[in-house]
Design a protein with these regions (language model features):
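Basic, glycine-rich
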Residues: 71-72, 99, 127-134, 141-145, ...
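Extended aliphatic helical segments
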Residues: 1, 20, 27-30, 35, ...
């Protein structure tokens, strides 16, 4: 449990809770089920400052996806009396994007950024004869490479599959990927899974094989 303490100017980690310092600053709060909590922007910055870069970006993307304002997040960040972690979170706010649809996509974007790749187009739609045939997570137009994060939920979770079996979902995904590969200008497709985007994973190898300019020295996924 994280608690915001207006009497503290330094963080404190206890066995069952973390105390976030709030001395000298106004803390915006809201009531949720009768419990006073910090508002969305304040909470997001509190968590981002105390998290590694991967988890922080997941939080920031989620807030933007829910309608949060980047300028409000930045203003809250810059208002903090401590400078520890501010530069790191400021850089993540430049990378964060509300079009990211899942935690896995957030981590994939961070990994590609850390590998020095150009910023991809997000949620790019491919159309043939005026009909959208696919919307992909990441598109690198100069390299002609599509990157998808495959969280595997679509194959396992019934609420995602609907009435389809896992086998039917796999077949549909195969047809979809074939259609994307057939689009003029698409020269490669890479699928990243969870273990590849985690530190020490094989994301650099998968991305390099697709045709993206990943440095040869990058053999495993960087630490966030």
């Amino acid at each position: 449990v994280a608690l915001t303490d207006p009497t503290r100017d330094r963080a404190q980690r206890l066995r069952f809770s973390d105390k976030v310092p709030a001395r000298g600053r106004d803390v915006a709060t809201v009531l949720i089920d009768g419990v006073e909590t910090t508002d969305l922007v304040t909470t997001a910055i509190d968590v981002a400052l105390r998290s590694d870069r991967g988890h922080a970006l997941v939080i920031l993307d989620a807030v933007l996806r829910r309608g949060g304002d980047r300028h409000d997040l930045l203003a809250e960040l810059e208002s903090r009396p401590t400078r520890r972690g501010v530069q790191r979170v400021r850089a993540l706010l430049e990378l964060a994007d509300g079009r990211i649809e899942s935690a896995g996509e957030s981590l994939a974007l961070l990994v590609m950024h850390d590998l020095g790749l150009p910023r991809p187009e997000l949620q790019h739609e491919f159309s043939v004869d005026g009909r959208c045939i696919a919307r992909v997570d990441f598109w690198f137009p100069e390299q002609g490479v599509v990157v998808e994060f495959d969280g595997l939920v679509k194959y396992r979770a019934g609420e995602v599959r609907g009435a389809r079996t896992a086998e039917e979902v796999v077949i549909a995904e195969k047809f979809r990927e074939d259609a994307v590969r057939a689009v003029p200008g698409v020269r490669g497709v890479a699928r990243l899974i969870w273990r590849e985007v985690l530190p020490g994973g094989d994301a650099p190898i998968t991305l390099r094989r697709s045709g993206l300019p990943v440095p040869l020295a990058s053999r495993t996924t960087p630490t966030w």
